[in-house]
Amino acid sequence: MSEGLVQAASIIAALLFIMSLAGLSKHETAKAGCWYGIVGMTIALVATIFGPQSEGTLWIIIAMIIGGVIGVQRALKVEMTEMPELVAILHSFVGLAAVLVGFNSYGLTHETDPVLMNIHNVEVFLGIFIGAVTFTGSIVAFGKLSGKINSKALMLPHRHKLNLAALVVSAFLMVAFLNNPDNIFPVLLMTAIALAFGWHLVASIGGADMPVVVSMLNSYSGWAAAAAGFMLSNDLLIVTGALVGSSGAILSYIMCKAMNRSFISVIAGGFGNDVQVSSDEEQGEHRETTAEEVAELLKNASSVIITPGYGMAVAQAQYPVAEITAKLRERGINVRFGIHPVAGRLPGHMNVLLAEAKVPYDIVLEMDEINDDFADTDVVLVIGANDTVNPAAMEDPNSPIAGMPVLEVWKAQNVIVFKRSMAVGYAGVQNPLFFKENTQMLFGDAKERVDDILTALNK
Protein backbone atom coordinates (compact mmCIF):
# COMPACT_ATOMS: atom_id res chain seq x y z
CA MET A 1 0.00 0.00 0.00
CA SER A 2 1.47 3.37 -1.07
CA GLU A 3 2.14 6.25 1.34
CA GLY A 4 -0.56 8.37 -0.33
CA LEU A 5 -3.16 5.63 0.11
CA VAL A 6 -2.20 5.24 3.77
CA GLN A 7 -2.64 9.00 4.34
CA ALA A 8 -6.04 8.94 2.62
CA ALA A 9 -7.12 5.95 4.72
CA SER A 10 -5.97 7.77 7.88
CA ILE A 11 -8.07 10.83 7.04
CA ILE A 12 -11.16 8.67 6.37
CA ALA A 13 -10.61 6.73 9.61
CA ALA A 14 -10.17 9.95 11.61
CA LEU A 15 -13.44 11.33 10.19
CA LEU A 16 -15.22 8.09 11.06
CA PHE A 17 -13.91 8.29 14.64
CA ILE A 18 -15.25 11.85 14.93
CA MET A 19 -18.61 10.69 13.51
CA SER A 20 -18.56 7.82 16.01
CA LEU A 21 -18.21 10.23 18.95
CA ALA A 22 -21.01 12.38 17.54
CA GLY A 23 -23.23 9.33 17.09
CA LEU A 24 -22.62 8.03 20.59
CA SER A 25 -23.82 11.33 22.06
CA LYS A 26 -27.49 10.44 21.39
CA HIS A 27 -29.58 7.32 22.07
CA GLU A 28 -31.09 7.35 18.59
CA THR A 29 -27.72 7.38 16.79
CA ALA A 30 -25.63 5.32 19.24
CA LYS A 31 -25.80 2.14 17.16
CA ALA A 32 -24.65 4.00 14.06
CA GLY A 33 -21.89 5.59 16.15
CA CYS A 34 -20.62 2.12 17.11
CA TRP A 35 -20.50 1.06 13.47
CA TYR A 36 -18.64 4.22 12.45
CA GLY A 37 -16.02 3.36 15.06
CA ILE A 38 -15.76 -0.28 13.94
CA VAL A 39 -15.35 0.67 10.27
CA GLY A 40 -12.85 3.42 11.14
CA MET A 41 -10.75 1.06 13.26
CA THR A 42 -10.80 -1.60 10.52
CA ILE A 43 -9.53 0.92 7.96
CA ALA A 44 -6.86 2.14 10.41
CA LEU A 45 -5.62 -1.39 11.11
CA VAL A 46 -5.43 -2.34 7.42
CA ALA A 47 -3.60 0.90 6.54
CA THR A 48 -1.12 0.40 9.41
CA ILE A 49 -0.42 -3.29 8.81
CA PHE A 50 0.01 -3.06 5.05
CA GLY A 51 1.65 0.38 4.93
CA PRO A 52 5.04 0.92 3.24
CA GLN A 53 6.90 1.17 6.59
CA SER A 54 5.30 -1.92 8.13
CA GLU A 55 7.56 -4.79 9.21
CA GLY A 56 6.81 -8.19 10.74
CA THR A 57 3.31 -8.34 9.24
CA LEU A 58 2.89 -12.03 10.06
CA TRP A 59 3.63 -11.47 13.76
CA ILE A 60 1.21 -8.53 13.85
CA ILE A 61 -1.59 -10.63 12.32
CA ILE A 62 -0.92 -13.50 14.76
CA ALA A 63 -1.05 -11.06 17.70
CA MET A 64 -4.31 -9.56 16.36
CA ILE A 65 -5.91 -13.00 16.02
CA ILE A 66 -4.94 -13.95 19.58
CA GLY A 67 -6.16 -10.60 20.94
CA GLY A 68 -9.34 -10.79 18.86
CA VAL A 69 -10.22 -14.27 20.12
CA ILE A 70 -9.67 -13.23 23.75
CA GLY A 71 -11.67 -10.04 23.21
CA VAL A 72 -14.64 -11.80 21.58
CA GLN A 73 -14.77 -14.46 24.31
CA ARG A 74 -14.67 -11.81 27.04
CA ALA A 75 -17.31 -9.68 25.32
CA LEU A 76 -19.68 -12.66 25.04
CA LYS A 77 -19.29 -13.55 28.73
CA VAL A 78 -19.25 -10.12 30.38
CA GLU A 79 -22.38 -9.02 32.24
CA MET A 80 -23.61 -5.43 32.09
CA THR A 81 -22.82 -5.16 35.79
CA GLU A 82 -19.16 -5.93 35.01
CA MET A 83 -18.79 -3.27 32.32
CA PRO A 84 -17.15 -0.64 34.59
CA GLU A 85 -14.29 -2.92 35.61
CA LEU A 86 -13.92 -4.16 32.02
CA VAL A 87 -13.54 -0.56 30.84
CA ALA A 88 -10.96 0.06 33.58
CA ILE A 89 -8.86 -2.98 32.67
CA LEU A 90 -8.96 -2.02 28.97
CA HIS A 91 -7.61 1.41 29.90
CA SER A 92 -4.72 -0.32 31.66
CA PHE A 93 -3.86 -2.14 28.42
CA VAL A 94 -3.55 1.20 26.61
CA GLY A 95 -1.22 2.50 29.32
CA LEU A 96 0.94 -0.62 29.26
CA ALA A 97 1.11 -0.47 25.46
CA ALA A 98 2.35 3.14 25.64
CA VAL A 99 5.09 2.10 28.09
CA LEU A 100 6.22 -0.78 25.87
CA VAL A 101 6.14 1.40 22.74
CA GLY A 102 8.22 4.01 24.58
CA PHE A 103 11.00 1.61 25.53
CA ASN A 104 10.92 0.04 22.07
CA SER A 105 11.07 3.46 20.39
CA TYR A 106 14.02 4.46 22.61
CA GLY A 107 15.98 1.40 21.56
CA LEU A 108 15.25 1.69 17.83
CA THR A 109 15.61 5.42 17.16
CA HIS A 110 17.59 6.36 14.03
CA GLU A 111 17.59 10.16 14.45
CA THR A 112 20.91 11.92 13.81
CA ASP A 113 19.89 15.58 14.10
CA PRO A 114 20.41 16.70 17.75
CA VAL A 115 17.23 18.80 17.83
CA LEU A 116 15.05 16.02 16.42
CA MET A 117 16.75 13.58 18.76
CA ASN A 118 15.84 15.74 21.77
CA ILE A 119 12.24 16.03 20.58
CA HIS A 120 12.05 12.26 20.17
CA ASN A 121 13.50 11.67 23.63
CA VAL A 122 10.93 14.04 25.18
CA GLU A 123 8.18 12.07 23.40
CA VAL A 124 9.60 8.80 24.74
CA PHE A 125 9.92 10.11 28.30
CA LEU A 126 6.43 11.65 28.45
CA GLY A 127 4.86 8.67 26.68
CA ILE A 128 6.28 6.23 29.21
CA PHE A 129 5.30 8.51 32.12
CA ILE A 130 1.67 8.93 30.99
CA GLY A 131 1.39 5.25 30.10
CA ALA A 132 2.75 4.08 33.46
CA VAL A 133 0.37 6.37 35.39
CA THR A 134 -2.57 5.12 33.31
CA PHE A 135 -1.55 1.48 33.74
CA THR A 136 -1.37 1.33 37.54
CA GLY A 137 -4.22 3.82 38.00
CA SER A 138 -6.50 1.64 35.88
CA ILE A 139 -5.44 -1.51 37.75
CA VAL A 140 -6.41 0.13 41.06
CA ALA A 141 -9.72 1.32 39.55
CA PHE A 142 -10.41 -2.24 38.37
CA GLY A 143 -9.69 -3.55 41.86
CA LYS A 144 -12.00 -1.01 43.52
CA LEU A 145 -14.84 -1.53 41.03
CA SER A 146 -14.65 -5.32 41.27
CA GLY A 147 -14.48 -5.26 45.07
CA LYS A 148 -10.96 -6.69 45.23
CA ILE A 149 -9.66 -3.45 46.80
CA ASN A 150 -11.33 -1.38 49.53
CA SER A 151 -13.30 1.45 47.91
CA LYS A 152 -12.40 3.95 50.65
CA ALA A 153 -9.90 6.66 49.80
CA LEU A 154 -6.30 6.00 50.85
CA MET A 155 -5.22 8.93 53.01
CA LEU A 156 -1.42 8.79 53.34
CA PRO A 157 0.27 11.49 55.45
CA HIS A 158 1.43 14.41 53.26
CA ARG A 159 -0.12 12.72 50.21
CA HIS A 160 -0.25 15.95 48.19
CA LYS A 161 3.41 16.63 48.90
CA LEU A 162 4.20 13.08 47.76
CA ASN A 163 2.34 13.68 44.48
CA LEU A 164 4.15 16.98 43.96
CA ALA A 165 7.51 15.39 44.78
CA ALA A 166 6.87 12.65 42.21
CA LEU A 167 6.23 15.25 39.50
CA VAL A 168 9.26 17.38 40.45
CA VAL A 169 11.63 14.39 40.59
CA SER A 170 10.29 13.15 37.24
CA ALA A 171 10.98 16.58 35.70
CA PHE A 172 14.58 16.51 36.96
CA LEU A 173 14.97 12.97 35.61
CA MET A 174 13.78 14.14 32.19
CA VAL A 175 16.45 16.87 32.17
CA ALA A 176 19.08 14.30 33.17
CA PHE A 177 17.90 11.96 30.41
CA LEU A 178 18.00 14.70 27.75
CA ASN A 179 21.55 15.65 28.80
CA ASN A 180 22.71 12.05 28.49
CA PRO A 181 20.32 10.01 26.28
CA ASP A 182 22.60 6.97 26.33
CA ASN A 183 21.95 6.50 30.05
CA ILE A 184 18.58 4.75 30.44
CA PHE A 185 18.66 4.80 34.27
CA PRO A 186 16.65 8.10 34.56
CA VAL A 187 13.92 6.56 32.38
CA LEU A 188 13.80 3.38 34.46
CA LEU A 189 13.64 5.37 37.71
CA MET A 190 10.93 7.64 36.28
CA THR A 191 8.92 4.57 35.23
CA ALA A 192 9.01 3.22 38.79
CA ILE A 193 7.95 6.63 40.16
CA ALA A 194 5.14 6.94 37.57
CA LEU A 195 3.82 3.46 38.41
CA ALA A 196 3.67 4.38 42.11
CA PHE A 197 2.22 7.81 41.26
CA GLY A 198 -0.62 6.28 39.21
CA TRP A 199 -1.41 3.81 41.96
CA HIS A 200 -1.53 6.56 44.60
CA LEU A 201 -3.62 8.93 42.45
CA VAL A 202 -6.52 6.49 42.11
CA ALA A 203 -6.11 4.82 45.50
CA SER A 204 -6.62 8.22 47.17
CA ILE A 205 -9.96 8.76 45.40
CA GLY A 206 -13.02 7.54 47.32
CA GLY A 207 -15.76 5.22 46.11
CA ALA A 208 -18.30 8.01 45.58
CA ASP A 209 -16.06 9.53 42.90
CA MET A 210 -15.36 6.30 40.98
CA PRO A 211 -17.55 7.16 37.96
CA VAL A 212 -15.42 10.29 37.53
CA VAL A 213 -12.28 8.16 37.85
CA VAL A 214 -13.43 5.92 34.99
CA SER A 215 -13.88 8.91 32.65
CA MET A 216 -10.62 10.44 33.93
CA LEU A 217 -8.71 7.22 33.14
CA ASN A 218 -10.40 7.23 29.75
CA SER A 219 -8.79 10.63 29.21
CA TYR A 220 -5.41 9.40 30.46
CA SER A 221 -5.53 6.42 28.08
CA GLY A 222 -6.22 8.81 25.19
CA TRP A 223 -3.19 10.94 25.98
CA ALA A 224 -1.11 7.76 26.36
CA ALA A 225 -2.24 6.69 22.88
CA ALA A 226 -1.43 10.15 21.48
CA ALA A 227 2.04 9.96 23.03
CA ALA A 228 2.53 6.56 21.39
CA GLY A 229 1.45 8.14 18.10
CA PHE A 230 4.17 10.78 18.40
CA MET A 231 6.78 8.13 19.13
CA LEU A 232 5.70 6.04 16.14
CA SER A 233 5.15 9.07 13.86
CA ASN A 234 1.59 7.82 13.36
CA ASP A 235 -0.71 10.78 12.64
CA LEU A 236 -3.90 8.74 12.99
CA LEU A 237 -2.90 7.48 16.44
CA ILE A 238 -2.17 11.06 17.50
CA VAL A 239 -5.60 12.25 16.29
CA THR A 240 -7.42 9.29 17.83
CA GLY A 241 -5.61 9.68 21.15
CA ALA A 242 -6.38 13.39 21.22
CA LEU A 243 -10.08 12.68 20.56
CA VAL A 244 -10.25 10.14 23.37
CA GLY A 245 -8.17 12.28 25.73
CA SER A 246 -10.14 15.47 25.21
CA SER A 247 -13.57 13.78 25.28
CA GLY A 248 -12.64 11.95 28.50
CA ALA A 249 -11.43 15.20 30.07
CA ILE A 250 -14.63 17.02 29.07
CA LEU A 251 -16.78 14.19 30.46
CA SER A 252 -14.79 14.24 33.71
CA TYR A 253 -15.32 18.00 34.00
CA ILE A 254 -19.06 17.69 33.36
CA MET A 255 -19.41 14.94 35.97
CA CYS A 256 -17.32 16.83 38.53
CA LYS A 257 -19.57 19.84 38.02
CA ALA A 258 -22.64 17.65 38.53
CA MET A 259 -21.14 16.33 41.79
CA ASN A 260 -19.92 19.72 43.01
CA ARG A 261 -16.39 18.32 42.98
CA SER A 262 -13.32 20.20 41.80
CA PHE A 263 -11.91 18.76 38.57
CA ILE A 264 -8.39 19.47 39.81
CA SER A 265 -9.12 17.69 43.09
CA VAL A 266 -10.10 14.49 41.29
CA ILE A 267 -7.16 14.65 38.88
CA ALA A 268 -4.80 15.24 41.82
CA GLY A 269 -6.17 12.33 43.80
CA GLY A 270 -8.62 13.94 46.18
CA PHE A 271 -6.78 17.24 46.73
CA GLY A 272 -8.83 19.63 48.83
CA ASN A 273 -11.51 17.14 49.79
CA ASP A 274 -10.59 16.76 53.46
CA VAL A 275 -13.91 16.11 55.23
CA GLN A 276 -14.87 14.42 58.47
CA VAL A 277 -16.41 11.01 57.96
CA SER A 278 -19.99 10.85 59.19
CA SER A 279 -21.13 8.08 61.48
CA ASP A 280 -22.61 5.04 59.75
CA GLU A 281 -24.86 4.25 62.72
CA GLU A 282 -28.61 4.18 62.14
CA GLN A 283 -30.26 7.53 62.80
CA GLY A 284 -33.72 6.44 63.93
CA GLU A 285 -36.52 3.95 63.26
CA HIS A 286 -37.22 2.77 59.72
CA ARG A 287 -40.54 1.48 58.39
CA GLU A 288 -40.90 -1.64 56.26
CA THR A 289 -43.48 -2.43 53.60
CA THR A 290 -44.50 -5.31 51.32
CA ALA A 291 -44.74 -5.73 47.57
CA GLU A 292 -48.55 -5.92 47.78
CA GLU A 293 -48.74 -2.62 49.68
CA VAL A 294 -46.41 -0.96 47.15
CA ALA A 295 -48.55 -2.27 44.27
CA GLU A 296 -51.66 -0.78 45.89
CA LEU A 297 -49.84 2.53 46.38
CA LEU A 298 -48.87 2.57 42.70
CA LYS A 299 -52.42 1.78 41.55
CA ASN A 300 -53.75 4.83 43.40
CA ALA A 301 -50.97 7.17 42.25
CA SER A 302 -51.22 9.69 39.42
CA SER A 303 -47.47 10.32 39.11
CA VAL A 304 -44.51 8.00 39.75
CA ILE A 305 -40.76 8.62 39.46
CA ILE A 306 -38.26 5.75 39.46
CA THR A 307 -34.67 6.51 40.50
CA PRO A 308 -32.39 3.56 39.67
CA GLY A 309 -28.88 2.91 40.96
CA TYR A 310 -26.16 0.29 40.88
CA GLY A 311 -28.34 -2.13 42.87
CA MET A 312 -30.70 -2.37 39.89
CA ALA A 313 -27.76 -3.30 37.67
CA VAL A 314 -26.52 -5.97 40.09
CA ALA A 315 -29.99 -7.56 40.37
CA GLN A 316 -30.64 -7.23 36.60
CA ALA A 317 -33.99 -5.69 37.56
CA GLN A 318 -34.25 -3.37 34.55
CA TYR A 319 -36.53 -5.76 32.62
CA PRO A 320 -39.29 -6.15 35.25
CA VAL A 321 -38.92 -2.41 35.99
CA ALA A 322 -39.65 -1.75 32.30
CA GLU A 323 -42.71 -4.05 32.54
CA ILE A 324 -44.04 -2.21 35.60
CA THR A 325 -43.50 1.07 33.77
CA ALA A 326 -45.54 -0.18 30.81
CA LYS A 327 -48.34 -1.47 33.10
CA LEU A 328 -48.63 1.81 34.99
CA ARG A 329 -48.59 3.88 31.80
CA GLU A 330 -51.42 1.72 30.43
CA ARG A 331 -53.42 2.80 33.48
CA GLY A 332 -52.78 6.45 32.60
CA ILE A 333 -50.23 7.01 35.36
CA ASN A 334 -47.40 9.42 34.56
CA VAL A 335 -44.20 7.38 35.01
CA ARG A 336 -40.73 8.85 34.57
CA PHE A 337 -37.15 8.01 35.47
CA GLY A 338 -34.73 10.31 37.30
CA ILE A 339 -31.08 9.60 36.49
CA HIS A 340 -28.22 10.98 38.56
CA PRO A 341 -25.07 11.79 36.52
CA VAL A 342 -22.96 9.38 38.58
CA ALA A 343 -25.52 6.63 39.21
CA GLY A 344 -23.84 3.26 38.76
CA ARG A 345 -20.14 2.73 38.26
CA LEU A 346 -19.47 4.48 34.97
CA PRO A 347 -20.94 7.43 33.00
CA GLY A 348 -24.34 6.61 31.48
CA HIS A 349 -24.59 3.24 33.26
CA MET A 350 -28.32 3.52 34.08
CA ASN A 351 -29.19 4.94 30.66
CA VAL A 352 -27.61 1.89 28.99
CA LEU A 353 -29.53 -0.54 31.22
CA LEU A 354 -32.87 1.18 30.61
CA ALA A 355 -32.25 1.36 26.87
CA GLU A 356 -31.42 -2.37 26.97
CA ALA A 357 -34.84 -2.98 28.58
CA LYS A 358 -36.57 -0.87 25.87
CA VAL A 359 -37.69 1.91 28.23
CA PRO A 360 -38.79 4.90 26.07
CA TYR A 361 -36.08 7.58 25.86
CA ASP A 362 -38.48 10.46 26.39
CA ILE A 363 -39.38 9.42 29.97
CA VAL A 364 -35.75 9.02 31.07
CA LEU A 365 -34.74 12.41 32.47
CA GLU A 366 -31.54 13.81 33.95
CA MET A 367 -31.35 15.07 37.53
CA ASP A 368 -31.59 18.77 36.60
CA GLU A 369 -34.68 18.09 34.48
CA ILE A 370 -36.65 16.23 37.15
CA ASN A 371 -35.53 17.50 40.57
CA ASP A 372 -38.19 20.21 40.73
CA ASP A 373 -40.97 17.65 40.11
CA PHE A 374 -40.47 15.44 43.18
CA ALA A 375 -42.59 17.72 45.38
CA ASP A 376 -45.60 17.05 43.10
CA THR A 377 -45.02 13.30 42.85
CA ASP A 378 -47.18 10.68 44.59
CA VAL A 379 -44.70 7.79 44.69
CA VAL A 380 -40.94 7.52 44.17
CA LEU A 381 -39.34 4.10 43.74
CA VAL A 382 -35.66 4.16 44.72
CA ILE A 383 -34.30 0.96 43.18
CA GLY A 384 -30.73 0.23 44.16
CA ALA A 385 -29.70 3.87 44.62
CA ASN A 386 -28.23 5.16 47.87
CA ASP A 387 -25.62 7.93 47.82
CA THR A 388 -27.32 9.69 44.87
CA VAL A 389 -30.53 10.16 46.92
CA ASN A 390 -28.85 10.95 50.25
CA PRO A 391 -30.17 14.18 51.85
CA ALA A 392 -26.98 14.36 53.96
CA ALA A 393 -25.30 15.82 50.88
CA MET A 394 -27.43 18.93 51.42
CA GLU A 395 -27.97 18.83 55.19
CA ASP A 396 -24.66 17.59 56.70
CA PRO A 397 -21.60 19.78 55.95
CA ASN A 398 -19.31 17.13 57.50
CA SER A 399 -20.51 14.35 55.20
CA PRO A 400 -18.00 12.95 52.65
CA ILE A 401 -20.62 13.70 49.98
CA ALA A 402 -21.41 17.21 51.29
CA GLY A 403 -22.28 19.61 48.49
CA MET A 404 -22.94 16.90 45.92
CA PRO A 405 -26.22 17.56 44.06
CA VAL A 406 -28.61 14.66 44.67
CA LEU A 407 -32.06 13.56 43.54
CA GLU A 408 -34.40 15.19 46.09
CA VAL A 409 -36.70 12.16 46.37
CA TRP A 410 -37.65 12.88 50.02
CA LYS A 411 -39.88 15.74 48.82
CA ALA A 412 -42.38 13.26 47.31
CA GLN A 413 -45.49 12.11 49.20
CA ASN A 414 -44.29 8.50 49.41
CA VAL A 415 -40.80 7.05 48.95
CA ILE A 416 -40.21 3.31 48.57
CA VAL A 417 -36.57 2.24 48.91
CA PHE A 418 -35.53 -1.14 47.50
CA LYS A 419 -32.54 -2.50 49.44
CA ARG A 420 -31.06 -5.81 50.51
CA SER A 421 -30.28 -4.45 53.99
CA MET A 422 -29.71 -1.24 55.93
CA ALA A 423 -26.02 -1.25 54.94
CA VAL A 424 -24.35 2.01 53.88
CA GLY A 425 -23.76 2.89 50.23
CA TYR A 426 -20.58 2.93 48.14
CA ALA A 427 -19.42 6.19 49.74
CA GLY A 428 -19.57 4.52 53.16
CA VAL A 429 -22.04 6.95 54.81
CA GLN A 430 -25.46 6.42 56.38
CA ASN A 431 -28.54 7.70 54.54
CA PRO A 432 -31.05 9.74 56.61
CA LEU A 433 -33.63 9.18 53.84
CA PHE A 434 -34.32 5.70 55.23
CA PHE A 435 -35.60 7.14 58.50
CA LYS A 436 -37.90 9.88 57.17
CA GLU A 437 -41.65 9.64 57.89
CA ASN A 438 -42.64 9.36 54.23
CA THR A 439 -40.10 6.60 53.47
CA GLN A 440 -40.74 2.84 53.58
CA MET A 441 -38.15 0.10 53.04
CA LEU A 442 -38.78 -2.90 50.79
CA PHE A 443 -36.03 -5.39 51.62
CA GLY A 444 -34.75 -8.21 49.44
CA ASP A 445 -33.37 -8.77 45.95
CA ALA A 446 -34.49 -5.87 43.76
CA LYS A 447 -35.51 -8.09 40.83
CA GLU A 448 -37.55 -10.44 43.06
CA ARG A 449 -39.32 -7.55 44.78
CA VAL A 450 -40.12 -5.84 41.47
CA ASP A 451 -41.44 -9.17 40.13
CA ASP A 452 -43.65 -9.47 43.24
CA ILE A 453 -45.03 -5.96 42.63
CA LEU A 454 -45.68 -6.86 38.99
CA THR A 455 -47.59 -9.97 40.07
CA ALA A 456 -49.68 -7.91 42.50
CA LEU A 457 -50.44 -5.33 39.80
CA ASN A 458 -51.73 -8.07 37.48
CA LYS A 459 -54.24 -9.37 40.04
Question: What do the predicted segments below correspond to?
Answer:
Residues 16-31, 68-87, 138-153, 197-210, ...:
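C-terminal ends of transmembrane helices
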Residues 80-136, 140-159, 262-273:
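Interhelical loops and loop-helix junctions of multi-pass membrane transporters/channels
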Residues 31-40, 60-62, 82-94, 153-164, ...:
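Cytoplasmic-side transmembrane-helix entry/capping segments in multi-pass membrane proteins
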Residues 282-459:
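Structured cytosolic domains appended to multi-pass membrane proteins
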Residues 243-301:
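Membrane-interfacial segments at transmembrane helix termini in multi-pass membrane proteins
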Residues 1-14, 51-69, 120-135, 181-193:
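Structural signature of hydrophobic alpha-helical transmembrane segments
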Residues 104-115, 179-185, 212, 219-240:
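Transmembrane helix-loop junctions at the membrane interface of multipass transporters and ion channels
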Residues 48-61, 73-83, 99-115, 181:
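Transmembrane alpha-helix boundary signature
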